[in-house]
Amino acid sequence: VNGIKKASPSVVGITATRFGVESVERASDDQLNLYLEEQDSLGSGVIVSDDGFILTNLHVVDNLFDLFDTEVTLNDGRRTPATVIAWDKANDLAVLHINMDNLTPIEIGDPEKSRVGDFVFAIGYPRNIGQSASLGIVSAITNNTDSTVSIIQTDAAINPGNSGGALIDSNGSLIGINSSIFSESGKFEGIGFATPSSIAIKSMKELVSRAIEANSGYLGVITGEALTSESSQIFFGRDNIRGMLVESVDRGGAAKRAGIKPGDVITRVEKTDVVNAEHILKEIRNKKPGEEITVQIFRDGKTLTLLTNLGFGEARIIDPTVKD
């Protein structure tokens, strides 16, 4: 019980909303020819770092790359958007990233110390009913040629939605990522499999390193027009405010965490005074995800200086006067 209590804050549910192609076929002549249909794709994931990296199975998210909303739910009820940043097909693993404070990364265990008969718990979000845990034992261990663990077999129930969740030992330490079941009926028959945490964590570190190297940072704001003397006078009653007017802020993004709000004006980023969108893009693209950035804003007649750590995403600002 103590092990479950310790590990449960680190296990999340994964929900995705995507385009539904079935809706086009069902549309009648008097309906819209195309509309959006929300569909939930459910799975689980494990928080493995306090800066927002989550491990899950690739098959949980491999059909979600074109979706318009991916979200994770924490054990405490908080929900936040997530970005799939990298994946490992060979080991059926994927890494997500979220921008959120006060995360509880799971303690990493040593699957090499596991023995057949050890008690284990599978924690996940089966069938959209919230987080649950199932008890089982290590049924079998398959080793590589160098005697390291390659797969853990367990009879702890891995039901639909549990994929990508945590297999923990009695101390609450992660020893595997729940991945699949063997079943002729499609239902759980007491034969489940987990990727050892040693393999999963090694893969995750390599994937994250490559993802950071390949991506520039992401602030998470949509800006409107660049302020001129005329628009500054209209919006703020004075003609000397220059910068980019913030129209919206990504939920869970770096800008949101910094406290940036719609209606703010971004006047300076790092040491660059902002006159148009390119000035913001230049500074963001010079930094990697996770790096700190200084943003100066104008709000309610005052100039504020905010700090935040950039996230993952495409650094692109919507501004009709600037082509990215």
Task: Give the positions of each predicted feature.
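Conserved active-site neighborhood of the chymotrypsin/trypsin-like protease fold
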Residues: 49-124, 128-132, 145-150, 160, ...
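Gly/Ser-enriched beta-turn/beta-hairpin loop segments
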Residues: 22-38, 85-91, 140-152, 182-187, ...
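C-terminal recognition in membrane/secretory proteostasis and scaffolding
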Residues: 2, 83-84, 97, 115, ...
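A conserved glycine-rich beta-strand in the N-terminal activation segment of trypsin-fold
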Residues: 1-2, 21, 32-53, 79-81, ...
